[in-house]
Amino acid sequence: MKLPGKIAIMGGGSWATAIAKIVLAQAESINWYMRRDDRIEEFKRLGHNPAYLTSVRFEIKNINFSSDINKIVKESDTLIF
């Protein structure tokens, strides 16, 4: 079963990383807000969160990262904090 609508993960910690992995198992893609651009770039480069749950790998092509909280909120139907 695929989750309906566009889902956003808010935050870049261990909880957000774990929830993102679970949501991506049921959604084609997600929006993911992280406060720090350097963490976003490192995440994209490595394919995992560089600071939390580093063994959990992600398909980066399925994630729309942004440090612009307003953009993520506007582009999402559901927000997960």
Annotate each predicted stretch with a short phrase.
Residues 1-56, 63-67, 73:
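NAD(P)+-binding Rossmann beta1-loop-alpha1 motif at the extreme N-terminus of oxidoreductases
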Residues 79-80:
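N-terminal Rossmann-like NAD(P) cofactor-binding module of classical short-chain dehydrogenase/reductase
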